[in-house]
From Swiss-Prot:
ATP binds at K535. ValRS has two distinct active sites: one for aminoacylation and one for editing. The misactivated threonine is translocated from the active site to the editing site. The C-terminal coiled-coil domain is crucial for aminoacylation activity. It is found in: Cytoplasm. The keyword Transcription regulation does not apply. One of its GO terms (molecular function) is ATP binding. Its EC number is 6.1.1.9. It comes from Lactiplantibacillus plantarum (strain ATCC BAA-793 / NCIMB 8826 / WCFS1) (Lactobacillus plantarum). Monomer. The gene is valS. A motif ('HIGH' region) lies at residues 50-60. This is Valine--tRNA ligase. Residues 816-889 form a coiled coil.
Amino acid sequence: MSEEPTTDMPTKYDPTAVEAGRYQTWLDQDLFKPSGDKKAKPYSIVIPPPNVTGKLHLGHAWDTTLQDIIIRQKRMQGFDTLWLPGMDHAGIATQAKVEAKLREQGISRYDLGREKFIQQVWDWKDEYASIIKQQWAKMGLSLDYSRERFTMDDGLSDAVKKVFVDLYNKGLIYRGEYIINWDPQARTALSDIEVIHKDDKGAFYHVKYPFADKDYTFNGKHYIEIATTRPETMMGDTAVAVNPSDDRYKELVGKKVILPLAEREIPIIADAYVDPEFGTGMVKITPAHDPNDFKVGNRHDLKRINTMNDDASMNANAGKYEGMDRFEARKAMVKDLEDQDLMIKIDPIVHSVGHSERTDVQVEARLSTQWFVKMKPLAEQALKNQEGDDAVDFIPKRFEDAFKQWMENIHDWVISRQLWWGHRIPAWYNKTTGETYVGVDGPKDPENWEQDPDVLDTWFSSALWPFSTMGWPNTDAEDFKRYFPTNTLVTGYDILPFWVSRMIFQSLEFTGRRPFKNVLLHGLIRDEHGVKMSKSLGNGIDPMDVIEKYGADALRWFLSNGSTAGQDVRFSYTKMDAAWNFINKIWNASRYVIMNLGTMDKPELPAASDWTLADKWILSRLNATVKQVTTTFDKFDFGEAGRALYNFIWNDFCDWYIEMSKEVLTGDDAQAKANTQNVLAYVLDQILRLLHPIMPFVTEKIWLSMPHVGESLVVAAYPVDHPEFDDETAESDMASLIELITAVRSIRAEANAKMSSAVDLLIKTDNTRLQAVFKANEDYIQRFAHPKTLSIGADVVAPKLAMTQVISDAEVYIPLAELVDLDEEVKKLEKEQAKFESEVARATKKLGNERFVANAPEDVVNSEKEKLADNQTKLAALKQRLVDIKAEA
């Protein structure tokens, strides 16, 4: 049921009162669900599912605000809209949070066991999913909760299993022993893009590797020199390599050296991998601890010796160092090498070291048996698709190049994770034969099989999000048929390789279509100094705190108005103050309009023949704004749309049209009053509709307080182009009047004269069109410029003593005597003259001092000369002005 209009609006905008209960009302009215109108064009967005690791941050607020603006506008434009909500289980991140919580209680996941630990994670998920939904409500997001999904829902889990099994059967998923990135704190494999490289202090350790043949020397030495940054992996060395084209070391190939500390012989081999220009041109080969060494080892059939446990402590292969942490082992080995005279030197360096994105610990390259996706065929398909009609449109366009570059240089994707929270890999191993079974449902004799304990990378299920949430693999599902592919994805550019790229290749592989028509990539939220917000820096801001102080609409306005595709945005409370002030301006303007509408049922524009110049102008400006906002929204240029709205509302509507309406509304002409009331109501109604996608709460409150038709702005029609409103002449004429009135106000302000004081106003112009405009609209000039006499024409003679403003095709004069007391002006100018004379004398004396000119820096001397010249010019003008005023007085 629609709320009744009211004129009882508080004098000040109170976001808490405005927003209270409104969201629940929208939900009760079922306004966020698709219309179900089969004749309407569908428009769908799936929310990038936030991780259930914790509360939403400002980045989420920005991301979802942009999506809500899009979906609200499309809904108002008559599209059959679906904005599908959901959340991500976020395997490693959520498990790490729960493990940290348990550690505070002195408990590990191993103490609980898999089943009880997973229940703890589900409890965590339920707690934070509830918090996230409360935050969505506070933000005013128009999500269809009847379709809410979670990446570990039964339906989505079925999709995950089907994709895994199908890729396996196609030969695109395989299991093997390879070097992978290993997080020793989470004790799981990581993909390349889950590794963040940071500059760390380290060292090159130059170590002697003695020849096995004690009688052999090379360059007069019984050893070769090997430089390494990781002496802790030495116990896993199985060769030393040189480049086959490196003539310096040809005689060494085939020789053997003694591995220091291990006293084990290893060969010197030739392999093109070695860069002869780097270091000594000789490198140690550790196939179990380096991806490049692993490849070299495969080519030369070298043994793989893993020297670390999964927590990065040393294992039995490390000999006496077994049980030590890797960094403790490094120190111990370095000391032993020094004690045995095997350390030549240590050179400190700063080098790039991989760290886990989630735990921030240094990642290990580790030999491990894992599941992988063979990426080349999938990447090639995605690249080919970008050349056709079904290509994904990247906004900004430059990110398509980043996408292509990543696809062209892609590595196989390690998808298994040694975690407990996530989608269990649908693979089983026969307890007797070791045979592998991969299937959606599992073996029929489960007692003879053991399921792989690992889970899938979080991004594996997230990559299916656009179509799995629509009912796939059931391709006959109504939502899948109507709303897939989705229209727009809005997300941060930082997850282009993690998520966007993977959704594209998985969607193409399993549906034959792109997952979304376009992807809008925004930047990061930074603080007012340009520093990325983070918990560790303590500069993060809770969006709920901002909403509590300023309201959701102000935050949404700031986030949308500061948005330029692909760019970062800086948060500042100064900008939030400005956002609140703008909404307060809208509130007060609306209050004025509503209080002056009388008993109107609904706004109806008067006949065009009854429009005043002000009416014609405001309707033309409104239509220009409608077209500009619609166009910029279609381009996802929210910042430009916001600027257009701000300029029209603040400048055109509030500062001018409302002011022009006041005399009419208080006048005796009933018809003119009714006409102005209707134009005011119509324009305000259109403003509220234009603003609603950005500021849903306050616009709804105001709209329901004024005469209206319909239950909610949520489903009201969005403004459209009215060509009959376009009026270039009215816009030009009003622009001239505004420029004139502004010029008169500037003169008064400069003279510190009252704005309402009556003055002689002279306008000199030989533009006959401009003369006609000013003469035809003397009532506006009288109302806003307050002239006691008005002279307009080409023959207007400028008073000898007047204040002047130049405007387009005209000069504006007001006699000085009408603005100021000439005797007082003389006194003021004489004081200024004395000040300038003193300054000129000071500078002249200083520049006449030869020691100053000779010894002071050149820029200081030049600055003093410039000041003197400037003050001399001002003094001369001041003296002439005094002469003129005294002559007049």
